[in-house]
Amino acid sequence: MYKFYFILISLLWFQHDSVQRGYSVELTQNDISNALEIHNKARIEVGLNIIEWSDDLSNEAQKWANNLAQKNKIYHSSNESRLNQGENLYYSFSSQNGKPIFSKSPAKEASLAWYNEIIDYKYSVYGSKLNESVMIGHYTQMVWKSTTKVGIALARSSDGKEYIVARYSPPGNFMGEYPY
């Protein structure tokens, strides 16, 4: 009888504990290729060199994505925790009949959203009054002239929210500087 209660309590504790946690989701090679293609298309359009995939940056991005999914909250990491890395964030959630529907290409979806900020972007130095009322920082990080590497990662919260984090090296978005 005592063993049964111990097992039941242990199972309930484990279940409660796992509900509080997010989890890593490995991106497919196809999704990585598509996301990188979108980044490089944006860069080529403005006359920049392409950037390369970095497993190291992807691993760093995964740590932060896991943190966001565990807390079920989106916010940027501190500059101190990601020295010499830029960061783009994306959040997604959709459901049908109360069940989450996951994106088939989350890194591609995020990259397209960041790229589409070009619609509002007016070429100027970062932080210019020309762009102060629009969100363009994800796009400018994608096309920052000195950036050479990117890594992207995905984590899901227990309720199905998807958190996508991209890390860039060297970082961009320096006040008073042109992105390209």
What are these regions (language model features)?
Residues 6-7, 46, 57, 106-108, ...:
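Intrinsically disordered, low-complexity regions enriched in Ser/Pro/Gly/Gln/His and often acidic
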Residues 93-180:
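Disulfide-stabilized extracellular recognition modules
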Residues 23, 27-86:
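Short, well-ordered surface patches within globular domains
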